[in-house]
Amino acid sequence: MPPVSQSIRVKVLFFGRLKEIAGRSHESVDLASEADIESLFARYASRYPELQQYRSSLVASCNQEFAPWNTVLHAGDEVAFLPPVSGG
Amino acid sequence: MAAPSTDITSLVHEPIDPASLAAYVRGNGDGAIVIFDGFVRDHSKNRRTLYLEYEAYEPMALAKIQEIAAHLHNQFSIHRVAMVHRLGRLEIGETSVYIAVSAAHRAAAFDACRYAIDTLKRTVPIWKKEYFEDGSVWADGELPPVPSATSAVKPAS
Protein backbone atom coordinates (compact mmCIF):
# COMPACT_ATOMS: atom_id res chain seq x y z
CA MET A 1 0.00 0.00 0.00
CA PRO A 2 1.39 3.44 -0.89
CA PRO A 3 2.11 5.83 2.00
CA VAL A 4 -0.59 8.37 2.87
CA SER A 5 0.16 11.45 0.81
CA GLN A 6 0.13 14.94 2.28
CA SER A 7 -0.16 16.59 -1.10
CA ILE A 8 -2.16 16.26 -4.26
CA ARG A 9 -1.23 17.00 -7.85
CA VAL A 10 -3.65 18.97 -10.01
CA LYS A 11 -3.46 20.29 -13.56
CA VAL A 12 -3.92 24.04 -13.98
CA LEU A 13 -4.89 25.77 -17.23
CA PHE A 14 -4.71 29.45 -18.16
CA PHE A 15 -6.56 31.19 -20.95
CA GLY A 16 -6.62 34.57 -22.66
CA ARG A 17 -4.71 37.30 -20.89
CA LEU A 18 -4.12 35.03 -17.90
CA LYS A 19 -2.09 32.75 -20.15
CA GLU A 20 -0.02 35.71 -21.27
CA ILE A 21 0.63 36.82 -17.69
CA ALA A 22 1.52 33.34 -16.48
CA GLY A 23 3.62 32.73 -19.60
CA ARG A 24 2.18 29.26 -20.00
CA SER A 25 -1.05 27.55 -20.95
CA HIS A 26 -0.89 24.77 -18.35
CA GLU A 27 1.17 23.10 -15.69
CA SER A 28 0.86 20.51 -12.96
CA VAL A 29 1.24 21.63 -9.36
CA ASP A 30 1.38 19.92 -5.98
CA LEU A 31 -0.96 21.30 -3.34
CA ALA A 32 -1.80 20.61 0.26
CA SER A 33 -4.55 18.02 0.37
CA GLU A 34 -7.28 20.41 1.60
CA ALA A 35 -6.46 23.18 -0.89
CA ASP A 36 -9.33 24.93 -2.64
CA ILE A 37 -9.41 26.89 -5.89
CA GLU A 38 -9.06 30.20 -4.05
CA SER A 39 -5.80 29.13 -2.43
CA LEU A 40 -4.53 27.84 -5.76
CA PHE A 41 -5.19 31.21 -7.34
CA ALA A 42 -3.53 33.00 -4.41
CA ARG A 43 -0.44 30.94 -5.01
CA TYR A 44 -0.27 32.12 -8.63
CA ALA A 45 -1.08 35.69 -7.66
CA SER A 46 1.92 35.75 -5.37
CA ARG A 47 4.10 34.37 -8.13
CA TYR A 48 2.64 36.72 -10.79
CA PRO A 49 1.37 39.83 -8.93
CA GLU A 50 -0.28 41.18 -12.10
CA LEU A 51 -2.82 38.36 -11.82
CA GLN A 52 -4.33 39.73 -8.62
CA GLN A 53 -6.14 42.58 -10.37
CA TYR A 54 -8.13 40.02 -12.39
CA ARG A 55 -9.35 38.00 -9.40
CA SER A 56 -12.77 39.70 -9.37
CA SER A 57 -13.23 39.44 -13.12
CA LEU A 58 -12.56 35.79 -13.75
CA VAL A 59 -14.23 32.51 -12.97
CA ALA A 60 -12.79 29.09 -12.33
CA SER A 61 -13.68 25.65 -13.53
CA CYS A 62 -12.93 22.25 -12.06
CA ASN A 63 -12.98 19.23 -14.36
CA GLN A 64 -14.56 21.36 -17.09
CA GLU A 65 -17.51 22.63 -15.04
CA PHE A 66 -17.75 26.15 -13.66
CA ALA A 67 -16.86 25.91 -9.99
CA PRO A 68 -17.10 28.19 -6.94
CA TRP A 69 -13.86 29.47 -5.43
CA ASN A 70 -14.22 27.34 -2.31
CA THR A 71 -14.25 24.09 -4.28
CA VAL A 72 -11.90 21.68 -2.53
CA LEU A 73 -9.49 20.03 -4.93
CA HIS A 74 -8.67 16.37 -5.29
CA ALA A 75 -5.75 14.58 -6.89
CA GLY A 76 -6.03 14.59 -10.65
CA ASP A 77 -8.45 17.52 -10.86
CA GLU A 78 -8.16 19.87 -13.82
CA VAL A 79 -8.60 23.49 -12.78
CA ALA A 80 -8.84 26.37 -15.23
CA PHE A 81 -8.88 30.13 -14.69
CA LEU A 82 -11.22 31.73 -17.22
CA PRO A 83 -11.43 35.42 -18.13
CA PRO A 84 -14.80 36.84 -19.24
CA VAL A 85 -15.79 34.85 -22.32
CA SER A 86 -16.05 36.60 -25.69
CA GLY A 87 -16.95 33.99 -28.26
CA GLY A 88 -19.44 34.61 -31.02
CA MET B 1 -27.35 15.73 -20.94
CA ALA B 2 -26.24 14.93 -24.47
CA ALA B 3 -27.59 16.60 -27.58
CA PRO B 4 -29.39 14.24 -29.93
CA SER B 5 -26.86 12.58 -32.19
CA THR B 6 -28.60 14.13 -35.17
CA ASP B 7 -27.28 17.57 -34.17
CA ILE B 8 -23.98 18.97 -35.39
CA THR B 9 -21.90 20.63 -32.66
CA SER B 10 -18.25 21.39 -33.26
CA LEU B 11 -15.23 23.63 -32.93
CA VAL B 12 -13.28 23.94 -36.16
CA HIS B 13 -9.99 25.46 -37.25
CA GLU B 14 -10.95 25.75 -40.91
CA PRO B 15 -13.54 27.96 -42.63
CA ILE B 16 -17.15 27.10 -41.81
CA ASP B 17 -19.31 25.92 -44.72
CA PRO B 18 -22.70 27.55 -44.05
CA ALA B 19 -24.54 25.96 -46.96
CA SER B 20 -23.84 22.41 -45.86
CA LEU B 21 -24.97 23.13 -42.29
CA ALA B 22 -28.17 24.79 -43.42
CA ALA B 23 -28.89 21.88 -45.74
CA TYR B 24 -28.16 19.41 -42.95
CA VAL B 25 -30.77 20.74 -40.53
CA ARG B 26 -33.45 21.01 -43.20
CA GLY B 27 -36.02 18.22 -43.05
CA ASN B 28 -39.24 17.46 -44.89
CA GLY B 29 -41.22 17.91 -41.70
CA ASP B 30 -39.83 21.40 -41.19
CA GLY B 31 -41.33 24.67 -42.26
CA ALA B 32 -38.53 27.02 -41.29
CA ILE B 33 -34.85 27.35 -40.59
CA VAL B 34 -33.46 30.27 -38.59
CA ILE B 35 -29.76 30.95 -38.99
CA PHE B 36 -27.37 33.08 -36.98
CA ASP B 37 -24.22 33.80 -38.96
CA GLY B 38 -21.71 35.75 -36.87
CA PHE B 39 -18.73 37.11 -38.81
CA VAL B 40 -15.74 39.36 -38.33
CA ARG B 41 -16.47 43.09 -38.42
CA ASP B 42 -13.89 45.52 -39.79
CA HIS B 43 -14.01 47.85 -36.80
CA SER B 44 -14.30 47.85 -33.04
CA LYS B 45 -14.97 50.96 -30.93
CA ASN B 46 -13.94 53.27 -33.78
CA ARG B 47 -10.71 51.41 -34.48
CA ARG B 48 -10.06 49.57 -37.71
CA THR B 49 -9.77 45.84 -37.05
CA LEU B 50 -7.18 43.90 -39.06
CA TYR B 51 -8.15 40.39 -37.98
CA LEU B 52 -9.22 38.36 -34.93
CA GLU B 53 -7.82 35.37 -33.14
CA TYR B 54 -10.10 33.02 -31.22
CA GLU B 55 -8.99 30.54 -28.61
CA ALA B 56 -11.02 28.11 -26.53
CA TYR B 57 -10.83 25.72 -23.65
CA GLU B 58 -11.74 23.21 -26.29
CA PRO B 59 -13.16 20.19 -24.44
CA MET B 60 -15.16 22.38 -22.06
CA ALA B 61 -16.32 24.70 -24.85
CA LEU B 62 -17.56 21.77 -26.90
CA ALA B 63 -19.35 20.31 -23.88
CA LYS B 64 -21.04 23.66 -23.21
CA ILE B 65 -22.14 23.97 -26.85
CA GLN B 66 -23.60 20.47 -26.64
CA GLU B 67 -25.42 21.41 -23.42
CA ILE B 68 -26.96 24.38 -25.22
CA ALA B 69 -28.09 22.20 -28.13
CA ALA B 70 -29.62 19.68 -25.76
CA HIS B 71 -31.42 22.45 -23.91
CA LEU B 72 -32.89 23.74 -27.18
CA HIS B 73 -34.58 20.39 -27.74
CA ASN B 74 -36.01 20.38 -24.22
CA GLN B 75 -37.22 23.94 -24.36
CA PHE B 76 -38.40 24.54 -27.92
CA SER B 77 -40.33 22.56 -30.52
CA ILE B 78 -37.47 22.25 -32.95
CA HIS B 79 -36.09 19.55 -35.22
CA ARG B 80 -32.33 19.84 -35.70
CA VAL B 81 -29.53 22.09 -34.52
CA ALA B 82 -26.15 22.90 -36.03
CA MET B 83 -23.79 24.97 -33.84
CA VAL B 84 -20.24 25.49 -35.04
CA HIS B 85 -17.61 27.91 -33.75
CA ARG B 86 -14.34 28.54 -35.55
CA LEU B 87 -11.00 29.05 -33.75
CA GLY B 88 -7.66 30.51 -34.77
CA ARG B 89 -7.06 33.52 -36.99
CA LEU B 90 -10.10 34.92 -38.81
CA GLU B 91 -10.05 37.63 -41.44
CA ILE B 92 -12.62 40.37 -41.91
CA GLY B 93 -15.91 38.94 -43.16
CA GLU B 94 -15.19 35.34 -42.21
CA THR B 95 -17.80 33.46 -40.22
CA SER B 96 -16.78 32.87 -36.59
CA VAL B 97 -19.98 31.24 -35.36
CA TYR B 98 -22.83 29.65 -37.26
CA ILE B 99 -26.06 28.39 -35.73
CA ALA B 100 -28.91 26.86 -37.72
CA VAL B 101 -32.13 25.61 -36.16
CA SER B 102 -34.94 23.91 -38.04
CA ALA B 103 -38.53 23.59 -36.86
CA ALA B 104 -42.02 22.96 -38.12
CA HIS B 105 -42.95 26.56 -37.27
CA ARG B 106 -40.93 29.75 -37.31
CA ALA B 107 -41.51 30.97 -33.76
CA ALA B 108 -39.73 28.03 -32.16
CA ALA B 109 -36.84 28.32 -34.61
CA PHE B 110 -36.41 32.06 -33.95
CA ASP B 111 -36.62 31.63 -30.18
CA ALA B 112 -34.23 28.69 -30.10
CA CYS B 113 -31.66 30.35 -32.33
CA ARG B 114 -31.73 33.52 -30.26
CA TYR B 115 -31.37 31.55 -27.04
CA ALA B 116 -28.48 29.58 -28.52
CA ILE B 117 -26.32 32.56 -29.55
CA ASP B 118 -27.09 34.54 -26.40
CA THR B 119 -26.19 31.59 -24.19
CA LEU B 120 -23.09 30.76 -26.20
CA LYS B 121 -21.79 34.30 -25.81
CA ARG B 122 -22.37 34.21 -22.07
CA THR B 123 -21.26 30.70 -21.09
CA VAL B 124 -18.95 29.03 -23.59
CA PRO B 125 -15.22 29.39 -22.77
CA ILE B 126 -14.04 30.99 -26.00
CA TRP B 127 -11.98 34.19 -26.17
CA LYS B 128 -11.34 36.65 -28.95
CA LYS B 129 -8.32 38.88 -29.41
CA GLU B 130 -8.70 41.88 -31.68
CA TYR B 131 -5.71 43.01 -33.74
CA PHE B 132 -5.41 46.62 -34.81
CA GLU B 133 -2.75 48.54 -36.69
CA ASP B 134 -1.25 49.71 -33.40
CA GLY B 135 -1.67 46.70 -31.16
CA SER B 136 -4.07 44.10 -29.88
CA VAL B 137 -6.58 43.67 -27.07
CA TRP B 138 -8.64 40.86 -25.59
CA ALA B 139 -12.26 41.68 -26.31
CA ASP B 140 -14.50 42.66 -23.42
CA GLY B 141 -16.49 39.63 -22.45
CA GLU B 142 -19.11 38.31 -20.12
CA LEU B 143 -18.47 36.48 -16.88
CA PRO B 144 -20.27 33.14 -16.96
CA PRO B 145 -22.63 32.39 -14.08
CA VAL B 146 -21.08 29.98 -11.60
CA PRO B 147 -23.05 27.71 -9.28
CA SER B 148 -23.00 29.28 -5.84
CA ALA B 149 -20.66 28.00 -3.18
CA THR B 150 -21.90 24.93 -1.45
CA SER B 151 -20.74 22.75 1.39
CA ALA B 152 -22.02 19.66 -0.36
CA VAL B 153 -19.41 16.97 -0.73
CA LYS B 154 -18.22 16.65 -4.27
CA PRO B 155 -18.41 13.05 -5.46
CA ALA B 156 -15.04 11.48 -6.01
CA SER B 157 -14.05 11.54 -9.65
Predicted stretch roles:
Chain A
Residues 1-87:
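Ubiquitin-like/PB1-type beta-grasp interaction modules and other compact soluble beta-rich domains
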